[in-house]
A protein has these predicted regions:
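Juxtamembrane intracellular "pre-TM" segments in multi-pass secondary transporters
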Residues: 3-11, 194-225
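Conserved MFS/SLC helix-loop-helix module at the cytosolic interface between two early adjacent transmembrane helices
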Residues: 67-106
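Helix-breaking motifs and short loop linkers at transmembrane-helix boundaries and internal kinks
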Residues: 48, 80, 101-107, 118, ...
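Intracellular juxtamembrane helix-capping segments at the cytosolic ends
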Residues: 121-134, 331-345
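Extracytoplasmic
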Residues: 17-51, 238-244, 367-371
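Cytoplasmic helix-loop-helix junction between adjacent transmembrane helices
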Residues: 111-149
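Extracytoplasmic gate region of multi-pass secondary transporters
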Residues: 36-37, 219-277, 364-372
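Helix-loop-helix hairpin linking two adjacent transmembrane segments in secondary transporters
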Residues: 145-194
Length: 418
């Protein structure tokens, strides 16, 4: 698609420095996002949380995240990544401090909501900037490597957190995270380029007026929407919450064993995103579009999740491996995010990305809380715990297959980017 805003590609050195600054902020965002999975046994015991409480607590972060996405896109397009991220990260600092000081479930939930709001720009802001600062053939790679950095954050949220817990406790941990977010603010303020606003793009001509309506009506965006909600959002919900309770309460892991399993799962995800960053430019040159890769790759995730469900408690020590393979197979859907951005001109990239992100994180919230509600509901009907987990996951699996089927039936009518 033709841009209506002139690009200003950075030199290699400046591009690396900008990437590092935003990547550190996103590292912290992913760490804080995923930390509830490692803390779930401790928080469940300390605050007497039910499955739906735990799902709501983890989902509260994503509710805050999703709530900002539509205004975030407009602000990014208008004010640029630097200014927006700095204001948002101030809210993230407040969220970390509030979590450290919380003495009730409602206090924890409010703190997670604030953290979600404050960290909600950490991926969309750099991706919006990369749309203008980086050459087109570098954008898929930059996106995959940002997700790889996020996986580093998720790795840091597992065993390192588990090791620190007996030494300092979870409250001190969140004070430290607040300090690191402040450091990230300094790095972004130092390295992020000034955002050039083009006045003519807002004042004249019918082409200057498109906004969220143009994004949500776009056939390519609409074909991707159900998968963003159920598949991408659901995979994040598994990785950041329900994998750990499954390993403990279905497969019989101890909390430490589950933390080790989650650590290696996140290492596997890190490796997957690194591999995508290396492989996608080569695949694209040979005609393998994002659509084609998603079409051919996603069924593997459905097969793996079905095997996990059917195996139940019989999967034993292989639970961590199975969940790692499932999450890795879901990384095909990560190709959709930069593809959606590239389907729009750069002056709409922020709104396109934030709209897509809204669907992802609304999906994370819905799946995290919905699975908790389903588990508690089936338990209330007298089901055994393992069976309740299996049925809740089966319902989720059916939704993901339906989302994929919708994509297959509509994609032939879309004009997806290469």
């Amino acid at each position: 698609m033709t841009d209506s805003v002139p690009t200003n590609h950075l030199s290699r050195r400046n591009a690396i420095l900008v990437f590092v600054a935003f990547a550190f902020a996103y590292f912290l965002s992913a760490l804080i996002r995923a930390i509830t999975a490692t803390l779930s046994p401790t928080l469940t015991q300390e605050f007497a949380l039910s499955a739906q409480d735990l799902g709501l607590l983890a989902g509260g972060y994503f509710l805050g995240f999703a709530a900002t996405q539509l205004p975030l896109g407009t602000w990014l397009d208008r004010h640029g990544p630097k200014k927006v991220v700095l204001y948002f990260l101030l809210v993230a600092v407040l969220g970390c401090v509030a979590f450290a000081m919380a003495d009730s479930f409602s206090g924890l939930l409010l703190a997670r909501f604030l953290s979600g709001v404050g960290l909600s720009a950490c991926l969309m802001a750099p991706l919006t900037g990369y749309r203008r600062w980086f050459a087109a053939n570098s954008q898929m790679r930059a996106s995959s490597w940002m997700l790889m950095i996020g996986s580093f954050g998720m790795v840091a949220s597992t065993l390192p957190v588990q090791w620190l817990m007996p030494l300092v406790g979870w409250r001190v941990l969140f004070w430290g995270l607040a300090a690191l977010v402040l450091l990230a603010m300094l790095m972004v303020a130092w390295q992020a380029p000034h955002w050039q606003t083009v006045a003519a793009a807002t004042d004249s001509g019918p082409a200057a007026k498109p906004g969220y309506g143009a994004v949500w009506r776009h056939p390519y965006f609409r074909s991707m929407a159900p998968m963003a909600f159920f598949i991408y959002g659901g995979q994040v919900a598994m990785q950041t919450l329900w994998v750990t309770p499954w390993m403990i309460r279905v497969a019989g892991f101890s909390p430490l064993q589950a933390a080790v399993g989650l650590f290696w799962l996140n290492v596997a995800m890190l490796t997957s995103f690194w591999a995508w960053g290396m492989a996608y430019p080569w695949l694209a040159r040979r005609g393998h579009t994002a659509d084609r890769l998603i079409s051919h790759g996603m069924p593997l995730s459905f097969i793996l999740l079905a095997l996990i469900i059917v195996a139940g408690s019989g999967i034993g020590v292989w639970a961590a491996v199975a969940w790692a393979l499932y999450c890795m197979s879901c990384t095909f859907i990560s190709l959709a995010q930069p593809a959606v951005a590239m389907a729009f001109p750069s002056n709409l990239a922020g709104r396109a990305l934030s709209s897509y992100n809204l669907l992802i994180f609304a999906g994370v919230f819905a799946v995290q809380w919905g699975i908790g509600l389903a588990i508690d509901g089936f338990r209330a009907l007298g089901w055994q715990e393992v069976s309740a987990f299996q049925m809740a996951m089966t319902i989720y699996l059916l939704f993901t297959v339906a989302a994929y089927a919708y994509f297959l039936t509509t994609k032939s009518h879309n004009q997806a980017p290469s």
